[in-house]
């Protein structure tokens, strides 16, 4: 974490030169040509891990510069991703998991410090139902045993089925979009929403009542006040 000796090591990720790191990520984006990029959010006050902060600081300018030939001409043919999302931990999720743990065993690892912490629920634009993929999600966490204790109730106090019942979602904030943004009262259920229409318009097809112009206008939503 911040101020710990490992973060002072010149070769650690936290100390990486920003422009060099952005250029390297731009090179990957131009090679892989993703339509959607997900990254850590701009509001990391709840868990300000230096590496998470660095990922955000690198990925945002990389998203913006990957489609501009003036940036990093050595990094390949320009490619502009269409959407960028920030991951977010919803307070609604925390409460749901906490209550499910209490119902299961009478105890929960979440104390008042966590339960009273403000969430970012009001910023959520996109909610994906991942109930059928919980085993892949938990398996990915267990694969990083040096980072996440596979016996830690914080992460694994509920089994996959119990977690899917308590809170079957992953939540996201649509941070940047070249395909528009959902209405304020609409929650997206697909990270690729709107992209099919843009691709179709670029090929001369139409989607009446959805997108009226093939012009891409970048829209930023979900900013921190």
Q: Which residues make up each language-model segment?
A:
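Metal-dependent de-N-acetylase/amidase catalytic core
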Residues: 3-11, 15-224
